[in-house]
């Protein structure tokens, strides 16, 4: 893991070719996100998820260190996720990878942005076949 002198790290990930049923299962996604936060070492504070008709789930897990979010589009096999952590104690990539694996994403494209350092440049771009 690269260390950064930053107030936070923000992973933005595009997950493609995910399992339709998992993307449309709100209780599953909620538990997956709570587990991802805990696996990364975060402290969960609040959880809010919403199931859309006919399909799709959006939600947020508020952690002491910031948040994890998802917007799922089962009809496209796609989910957009954000994992933002403050400080350098927690690696947001741990949670993002756990989520991608849990949704059976075939492809994950992500970037990591340092936050709170003024002007920023993209520190990492990764496309990964899972």
Swiss-Prot record:
Catalytic activity: S-adenosyl-L-methionine + H(+) = S-adenosyl 3-(methylsulfanyl)propylamine + CO2
EC number: 4.1.1.50
Statement: the UniProt record of this protein carries the keyword Lyase: yes
Family, as annotated: Belongs to the prokaryotic AdoMetDC family. Type 1 subfamily.
Pathway: Amine and polyamine biosynthesis; S-adenosylmethioninamine biosynthesis; S-adenosylmethioninamine from S-adenosyl-L-methionine: step 1/1
Description of post-translational modifications: Is synthesized initially as an inactive proenzyme. Formation of the active enzyme involves a self-maturation process in which the active site pyruvoyl group is generated from an internal serine residue via an autocatalytic post-translational modification. Two non-identical subunits are generated from the proenzyme in this reaction, and the pyruvate is formed at the N-terminus of the alpha chain, which is derived from the carboxyl end of the proenzyme.
Keyword S-adenosyl-L-methionine: yes
Site annotation Cleavage (non-hydrolytic): residues: 65-66
GO molecular function: adenosylmethionine decarboxylase activity
SS bond list: none
Purpose of the protein: Catalyzes the decarboxylation of S-adenosylmethionine to S-adenosylmethioninamine (dcAdoMet), the propylamine donor required for the synthesis of the polyamines spermine and spermidine from the diamine putrescine.
Cofactor binding note of this UniProt entry: Binds 1 pyruvoyl group covalently per subunit.
Keywords assigned by UniProt, alphabetized: Autocatalytic cleavage, Decarboxylase, Lyase, Polyamine biosynthesis, Pyruvate, S-adenosyl-L-methionine, Schiff base, Spermidine biosynthesis, Zymogen
InterPro entries: AdoMetDC_C, AdoMetDC_fam_prok, AdoMetDC_N, S-AdoMet_deCO2ase_core, S-AdoMet_deCOase_pro-enz
GO CC aspect terms: cytosol
NCBIfam families recorded: SAM_DCase_Bsu
Protein name: S-adenosylmethionine decarboxylase proenzyme
Oligomeric and partner information: Heterotetramer of two alpha and two beta chains arranged as a dimer of alpha/beta heterodimers.
HAMAP family per record: AdoMetDC_1
Biological processes annotated in GO: spermidine biosynthetic process
Modified residues (Pyruvic acid (Ser)): 66
Cofactor(s) the protein needs: pyruvate
Pfam families cross-referenced by the UniProt entry: AdoMet_dc
Taxonomic source organism: Bacillus cytotoxicus (strain DSM 22905 / CIP 110041 / 391-98 / NVH 391-98)
